[in-house]
Swiss-Prot record:
The gene is AANAT. Residues 1-29 are annotated as: Disordered. It catalyses: a 2-arylethylamine + acetyl-CoA = an N-acetyl-2-arylethylamine + CoA + H(+). This is Serotonin N-acetyltransferase. Highest expression in the pineal gland, followed by retina. Expressed at much lower levels in brainstem and pituitary gland. AANAT activity also detected at low levels in the olfactory lobe. It comes from Ovis aries. Acetyl-CoA binds at L124, A125, V126, Q132, Q133, G134, K135, G136, S137, Y168, Q169, R170.
């Protein structure tokens, strides 16, 4: 897939709905921007995996993606990723791929289907030093804004543990029932978000 213009995604003004922390402040004047949002590249894979491993293994004992899978998705579909960098340091990320079926399956964990219309969010993680600051919320809102602007993408899908269902509902996701994917003893709820509905939510937040 040709992606000549997505590797340097620039921050854009974004109105957040009530209850979600505000977007980062203005960039300070020095060499590295105080806050930068951009699509990730394979060169970012090691930093991504370091954050992911600490965030997920400490909670569930499993990583959604191993290092090879991170590199795989950042090579095939970098436009479906988004990283938040503070003074050049990666502090939070989302990695996704396209999926072409109504529901997630075991295959969806490792595949990118270029003709799909669903952005499958594989992982969202925040560096431990930057948690409890609302960064996950800001990044997810920006990500949905970003992928929703891509003509091929009609919805976002993910799987999460039951405790996280209310968090994702704040962004327009709705439970689609138990996910067919099981990881060890862990079970998940599958969540769907129409990006057309998300655009309407953005418009309402501007009022």
């Amino acid at each position: 897939m040709s992606t000549p213009s997505v590797h340097c995604l620039k921050p854009s003004p974004l109105h957040l709905p009530s209850g979600i922390p505000g977007s980062p402040g203005r960039q300070r004047r020095h060499t590295l921007p105080a806050n930068e949002f951009r699509c990730l590249t394979p060169e970012d894979a090691a930093g991504v995996f370091e954050i992911e491993r600490e965030a997920f293994i400490s909670v569930s004992g499993n990583c959604p993606l191993n290092l090879d899978e991170v590199q795989h998705f950042l090579t095939l579909c970098p436009e479906l990723s988004l990283g938040w960098f503070v003074e050049g340091r990666l502090v939070a990320f989302i990695i996704g791929s396209l999926w072409d079926e109504e529901r997630l399956t075991q295959e969806s964990l490792a595949l990118h289907r270029p003709r799909g219309h669903s952005a499958h969010l594989h992982a969202l993680a925040v560096h431990r030093s930057f948690r409890q600051q609302g960064k996950g919320s800001v990044l997810l809102w920006r990500y949905l804004h970003h992928v929703g602007a891509q003509p091929a993408v009609r919805r976002a899908v993910l799987m999460c543990e039951d405790a996280l269902v209310p968090f994702y509902q704040r962004f327009g996701f709705h439970p689609a029932g138990p996910c067919a994917i099981v990881v060890g003893s862990l079970t998940f709820t599958e969540m769907h978000c129409s990006l057309r509905g998300h655009a309407a939510l953005r418009r309402n937040s501007d009022r």
